[in-house]
């Protein structure tokens, strides 16, 4: 489906609102866009009225008849608050919660499942003897295999989203792609549960079904992940700041960027509520065995088809628009040709502006894009450039592959599963998100203190640097105190270092995600054309795949006695990169947060 002529760039809250005011008065373009949407046959935008859930007294309903653009004086003096969030957006967040709960629940126990053999004296289902310091296990392929396969799984889970985004944007639409992904993921969970039956593990035949289930789980997640967050944000259809009088009599500016930020914080918090579900699976592997540890994720996964069936006729569904992808690649290709491949050339996109092309090629006919389309390409590429800084960041957020729970296996546990502390990552996020949403960010807006998107990402990077430094010091201490010295990983005795010393690494990593990852999702949606949002989100997710690829390169070094540098190397690299990132990109703290206008 092709939309009408591209709209003028809109802005969101912390962008220069004077430009947004000008855009607010271009009603004819917005009306033309609405007519183009209403004329699309088939699975198009749902116009049915929606219930709106309002969780904050400072959030208000976006009643169209009260829309008024703020004046310049109001921009300087009025408080900026988020708008109301449709109920469908919250329900989609719960859909994502169920998918992430099943995904993290299975993934959290996969490290021990792959690395360690069935414990001696255990129950034959993978659980160790009661009171033992032995970790749960099943396949016994060792640490290097476990880390490498974990990285391959992560790599596939974040590469396949590019295909999932293309399928959604160009062929079947986001919602139908989500349904296909859910079906494949369901098959994966069935195979995973069947392969963890004690008789299969005891016969040494658990590897093949586990590998098949991992691949299918990655495929299903790859179709689901890039499309769910854009679909959540599609439910919010107001992209222009406007003035609203609260019941108290106070006039405020309803800030679309603040609304979008709140939606993504809630979305990310529910992802991590789902991740907290792994607490049940790690205790299941330790106390009962892997058949239960994999059954629990499968049970919660059943919520997905039920909730999607309920939401089917209530959602705003954006139809596929292959024309947007085609136009993007045409503009980029012509830019490369016109600049002879010199991507560093100043004014790289000036030569493909419609006026410049018509002047250079007057007999070639009308140009099939507008200046707005060229600007969209520029802004999308800036977002993609920012995403290139995330792979090294991800290496520091929890370490390379499954190295953090492997480190915990060499520490004093006193009955605590070595992969239990991973649950403090989602716990920290669950606590931090409400604090940021309802206390910190409103206080900053009320005090007119700008905490821009680049500042938030930079803070997240620095928190990850500190997290990596802590893990480096913990690993050094393990080597110094282990009975086997610098061969602590394979030592039959653990180092007299409490596993709780890993807690700062998990907490700092979680705090960093609240700033870096959440802002990354915002940028992916807001800086991309409407017909490319899933694709740009998939490119943000692809940064995790690049991180996994870097981890695979480091895999040969993930052995004693080199583990200190496996932690310290990425930490140093991220510290240097963060300085470069801030210097190069801080100017984007104040630029337009441009997205489609549809009011």
From Swiss-Prot:
Molecular function GO terms recorded: transmembrane transporter activity
Membrane-crossing segments per the record: 147-167, 178-198, 204-224, 263-283, 291-311, 386-406, 424-444, 454-474, 539-559, 563-583
GO cellular component: membrane
Residue positions the entry lists as glycosylated: 517
Entry keywords, A to Z: Glycoprotein, Membrane, Transmembrane, Transmembrane helix, Transport
Protein location: Membrane
InterPro entries, sorted: MFS_trans_sf (IPR036259), POT_fam (IPR000109)
Region span, Disordered: 23-42
Keyword Glycoprotein: yes
Topology of this chain in the membrane: Multi-pass membrane protein
Ranges of biased composition (kind: Basic and acidic residues): 23-34
Family: Belongs to the major facilitator superfamily. Proton-dependent oligopeptide transporter (POT/PTR) (TC 2.A.17) family.
Stated role: MFS-type transporter; part of the gene cluster that mediates the biosynthesis of UCS1025A, a member of the pyrrolizidinone family that acts as a strong telomerase inhibitor and displays potent antibacterial and antitumor properties. These compounds share a hemiaminal-containing pyrrolizidinone core fused with a gamma-lactone, giving a furopyrrolizidine that is connected to a decalin fragment.
Protein name: MFS-type transporter ucsM
Source organism per UniProt: Acremonium sp
Name of the gene encoding the protein in the UniProt record: ucsM
């Amino acid at each position: 489906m092709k939309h009408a002529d591209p709209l003028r760039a809109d802005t969101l809250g912390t962008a220069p609102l004077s430009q947004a005011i000008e855009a607010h008065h271009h009603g004819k373009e917005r009306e033309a866009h609405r007519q183009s949407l209403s004329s699309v046959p088939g699975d198009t935008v749902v116009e049915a009225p929606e219930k709106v859930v309002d969780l904050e007294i400072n959030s208000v309903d976006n009643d169209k008849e009260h829309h008024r653009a703020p004046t310049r004086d109001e921009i300087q003096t009025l408080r900026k608050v988020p708008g109301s969030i449709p109920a469908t957006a919250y329900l989609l967040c719960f859909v994502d919660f169920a998918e992430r709960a099943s995904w993290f629940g299975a993934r959290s126990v996969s490290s021990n499942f792959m690395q360690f053999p069935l414990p001696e004296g255990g129950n034959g289902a993978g659980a160790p003897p009661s009171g033992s310091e032995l970790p749960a296990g099943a396949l016994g392929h060792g640490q290097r295999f476990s880390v490498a396969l974990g990285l391959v799984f992560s790599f596939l889970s974040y590469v396949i989203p590019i295909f999932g985004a293309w399928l959604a944007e160009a062929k079947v639409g986001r919602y139908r792609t989500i349904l296909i992904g859910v079906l494949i993921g369901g098959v994966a969970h069935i195979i995973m549960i069947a392969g963890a039956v004690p008789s299969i593990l005891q016969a040494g035949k658990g590897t093949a079904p586990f590998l098949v289930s991992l691949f299918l789980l990655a495929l299903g997640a790859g179709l689901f992940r890039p499309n769910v967050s854009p679909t959540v944000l599609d439910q919010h259809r107001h992209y222009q700041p406007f003035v609203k009088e609260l019941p108290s009599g106070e006039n405020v500016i309803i800030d679309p960027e603040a609304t979008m930020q709140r939606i993504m914080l809630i979305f990310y918090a529910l992802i991590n509520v789902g991740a907290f579900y792994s607490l049940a699976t790690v205790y299941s592997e330790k106390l009962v065995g892997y058949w239960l540890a994999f059954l629990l994720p499968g049970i919660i996964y059943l919520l997905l088809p039920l909730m999607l069936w309920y939401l089917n006729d209530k959602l705003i569904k954006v139809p596929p628009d292959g024309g947007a992808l085609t136009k993007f690649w045409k503009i980029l290709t012509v830019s490369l040709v016109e600049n002879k491949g010199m991507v560093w050339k100043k004014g790289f996109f000036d030569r493909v502006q419609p006026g410049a092309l018509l002047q250079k090629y007057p007999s070639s006919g009308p140009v099939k894009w507008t200046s707005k389309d060229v600007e969209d390409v520029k802004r999308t590429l800036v977002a993609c450039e920012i995403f290139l800084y995330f792979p090294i960041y991800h290496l520091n957020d929890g370490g390379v592959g499954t190295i953090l729970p492997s480190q915990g296996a060499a520490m004093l546990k006193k009955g605590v599963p070595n992969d239990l502390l991973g649950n403090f990552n989602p716990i920290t996020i669950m606590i931090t998100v409400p604090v940021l949403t309802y206390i910190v960010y409103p206080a900053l807006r009320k005090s007119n203190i700008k905490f821009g998107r680049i500042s938030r990402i930079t803070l997240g990077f620095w928190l990850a640097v500190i997290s990596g430094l802590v893990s480096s010091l913990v690993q050094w201490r393990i080597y110094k105190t282990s009975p086997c010295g610098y061969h602590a990983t394979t030592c039959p005795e653990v180092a007299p270092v409490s596993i709780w010393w890993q807690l700062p690494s998990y907490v700092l990593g979680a705090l960093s995600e609240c700033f870096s990852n959440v802002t990354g999702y915002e940028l992916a949606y807001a800086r991309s054309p409407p017909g490319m949002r899933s694709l740009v989100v998939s490119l943000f997710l692809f940064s995790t795949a690049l991180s996994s690829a870097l981890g695979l390169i480091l895999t040969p070094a993930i052995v004693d006695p080199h583990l200190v540098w496996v932690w310290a190397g990425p930490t140093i690299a991220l510290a240097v990169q963060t300085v470069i990132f801030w210097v190069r990109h801080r100017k984007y703290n104040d630029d337009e947060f441009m997205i489609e206008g549809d009011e």
